[in-house]
């Protein structure tokens, strides 16, 4: 599991997950089984969506798993938990001890958070995007105008609205506008090709899409039109009959598409009172977003997360990280990923920090932005921070404003933590772990933890979270024993969107999320991720799933069989290697297949090397023996 990206950097390739805790992964979900009997709890079971549809989630069973406060205390067998924020972050570490960490109870919905921030931080700088600078009051006005346009376009509460664009002010405004109108946000990975985006749009039954014009030399509009040009629909993309409108976040758009300016103008007839009434009617347990994460089946699945889950999780994240009013936050983690969106946009709204979105990871640009904008907060995968430390021009830039780094999604060397603290004098360096299915955050180190704990572990459970290390039968294991990491708490997704079978595989009847990761809990409750049960590997912080890559490569007419594994890479941590069997008579070369793959899939999925073989090793049941391929690679 995991998001496609916990936070990936564009240069590193996208993906998601496992490190989302800032680290989706920095790059970067189950169940709505919220705290039993608490206000804003009971987050599970999905919620009825627009137009009389069935619940969004597909959770197995509806019964609560009990009040987490009665669960076994930390130290019992291989379980750890944390319910009280004061236990998680002692008062000595709290920078604002009077603030209520229950963001779900404070704001109710993301729409409520946006309006509160627009009032509370009205004159503070909210977003810096190139030469554009806007205050929180101006951001609130823009979001309300976008919400009005969504309502004018026919968006109803529960409808899915997608955004396919890089980190920009327009992403922030369009996404928050859709959510304020009561829609369920569906972020699309900017590394997707047209067919990949079309699949998610079709699977989520998206009604409205916001899309960038051209990004990194690719016309997203042209890519979509090629992939969805033929079909039964009468809308802008015939192969997607439920997609009623496509809005291009630019000044021009092809026929049957709308420009951003035209779309916004359409909402001018909607009274502000109507927008605020719509926003104020959003229940806290209503779905706020669906994060699609690829799985070992090769087909993306949508983790449904509620407003209450997002607000509670990232109020806690902000508290534990020490994010504060006046911080200036360079958001390199993609907005399409849980971490970029929620530990970025949502957290900044909560604390009044300034968002400085960066659409593409480029070390020179990052260094320049840190110096010019006096950046104080810089989450990202380890590759980002290693690139900064190793840059030959580093000392020519003023980096003294940096005070907070959150990382994860990959192995974090002790030397990296020590260098960030020692050479850049960064006061707070933290690591964390999460996955899309658990709202992107499960564990997190605490300010004040020694460098050895920060580098070797992903920290302790965040408030309201239970962790269990299990054997293959689901029995809890003692401290120090490796097993699968199971998670239970208020942040577990409401289920995979309209997929009860996959939801039942992911979540036990009593609410435990099977993460598919192998980990160890130490006596202090710190979690160390040691392996992955699945074959997933992480490319620069983006989760890459062999089954999905194999399915795509298998579409090549000259490929008879293929298996993909992750291999070590000095820059990205891991990259893919494909073992492929050519069809008889084929003269396909490795370079040919790699070039073809770059045209057909997101670049982080593209194998960096290809080895042709006469056959793949298989066991008696026909399953490919990937351990043999890994052993072959090591020799």
What are these regions (language model features)?
Residues 102-106, 110-115, 120-168, 172, ...:
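Conserved AMP-binding/adenylate-forming core of the ANL superfamily
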Residues 105-107, 122-123, 239-240, 247-248, ...:
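Conserved pre-ATP/AMP-binding loop-to-beta segment of ANL
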Residues 468, 479-493, 512, 518-519:
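AMP-binding/adenylate-forming core of the ANL superfamily
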Residues 311-328, 336-377, 391:
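Conserved AMP-binding/adenylation subdomain of ANL enzymes
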Residues 3-7, 17-18, 51, 152-153, ...:
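Structural core segment of the AMP-binding/adenylate-forming
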Residues 135-138, 280-312:
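Conserved AMP-binding A3 loop
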Residues 262-265, 375-380, 389-453, 466, ...:
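Gly/Ser/Thr-rich phosphate-binding loop
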Residues 1-9, 192-198, 209-211, 378, ...:
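AMP-binding/adenylate-forming catalytic core of the ANL superfamily
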């Amino acid at each position: 599991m995991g998001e496609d990206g916990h936070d990936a950097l564009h240069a590193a390739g996208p993906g998601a997950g496992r490190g989302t805790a800032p680290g989706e992964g920095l790059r970067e979900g189950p169940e709505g089984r919220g705290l039993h009997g608490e206000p804003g709890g009971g987050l599970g079971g999905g919620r009825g969506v627009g137009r009389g549809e069935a619940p969004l989630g597909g959770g197995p069973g509806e019964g609560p798993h009990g009040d987490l406060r009665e669960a076994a205390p930390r130290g019992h067998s291989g379980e750890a938990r944390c319910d009280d924020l004061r236990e998680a972050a002692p008062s000595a570490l709290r920078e604002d001890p009077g603030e209520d960490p229950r963001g779900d109870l404070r704001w109710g919905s993301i729409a409520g958070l946006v309006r509160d921030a627009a009032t509370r931080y009205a004159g503070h700088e909210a977003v810096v995007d190139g030469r554009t600078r806007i205050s929180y009051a101006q951001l609130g006005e823009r979001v309300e105008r976008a919400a009005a346009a969504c309502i004018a376009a026919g968006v109803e509460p529960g409808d899915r609205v997608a955004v396919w664009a890089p980190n920009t002010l327009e992403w922030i405004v369009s996404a928050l506008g859709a959510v304020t109108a009561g829609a369920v946000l569906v972020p699309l990975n900017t590394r997707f090709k047209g067919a990949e985006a079309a699949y998610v749009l079709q699977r989520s039954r998206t009604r409205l899409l916001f899309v960038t014009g051209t990004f990194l030399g690719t016309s997203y509009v042209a890519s979509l039109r090629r992939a969805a040009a033929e079909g039964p629909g009468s809308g802008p993309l015939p192969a997607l009959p439920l997609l009623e409108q496509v809005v291009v976040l630019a000044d021009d758009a092809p026929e049957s598409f709308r420009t951003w300016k035209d779309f916004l103008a359409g909402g001018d007839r909607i009274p502000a009172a109507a927008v605020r009434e719509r926003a104020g009617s959003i229940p806290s347990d209503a779905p706020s977003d669906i994060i699609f994460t690829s799985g070992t089946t090769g087909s993306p699945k949508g983790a449904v997360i509620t407003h209450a889950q997002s607000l509670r999780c990232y109020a806690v994240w902000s508290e534990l990280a020490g994010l504060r009013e006046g911080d200036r936050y360079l958001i390199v983690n993609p907005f399409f990923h849980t971490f970029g969106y929620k530990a970025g946009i949502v957290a900044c709204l909560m604390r009044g920090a300034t968002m400085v979105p960066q659409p593409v990871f480029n070390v020179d640009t990052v260094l320049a932005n840190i110096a010019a904008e006096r950046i104080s907060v810089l989450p990202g995968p380890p590759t980002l921070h290693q690139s900064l430390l190793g840059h030959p021009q580093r000392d020519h830039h003023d980096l003294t404003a940096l005070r907070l780094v959150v990382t994860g999604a990959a192995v974090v060397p002790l030397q990296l933590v020590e260098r960030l603290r020692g050479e850049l004098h960064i006061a707070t360096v933290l690591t964390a772990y999460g996955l899309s299915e658990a709202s992107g955050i499960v564990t997190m180190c605490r300010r004040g933890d020694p460098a050895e704990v920060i580098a070797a572990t992903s920290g302790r459970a965040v408030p309201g979270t239970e962790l269990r290390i299990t054997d293959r039968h689901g029995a809890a294991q003692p401290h120090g024993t490796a097993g699968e990491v199971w998670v239970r708490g208020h942040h577990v997704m409401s289920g995979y969107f309209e997929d009860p079978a996959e939801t039942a595989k992911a979540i036990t009847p009593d609410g435990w999320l099977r993460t598919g990761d192998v980990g160890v809990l130490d006596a202090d409750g710190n979690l160390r991720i040691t392996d992955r049960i699945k074959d997933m590997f992480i490319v620069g912080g983006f989760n890459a799933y062999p089954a999905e890559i194999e399915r795509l490569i298998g579409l090549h007419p000259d490929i008879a069989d293929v298996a993909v594994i992750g291999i070590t890479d000095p820059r990205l941590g891991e990259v893919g290697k494909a073992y492929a069997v050519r069809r008889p008579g084929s003269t396909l070369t490795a370079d040919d297949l790699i070039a073809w793959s770059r045209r057909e899939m997101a670049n982080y999925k593209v194998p960096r090397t290809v080895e042709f073989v006469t056959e793949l090793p298989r066991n008696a049941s026909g399953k490919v023996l990937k351990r043999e391929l890994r052993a072959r690679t090591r020799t």
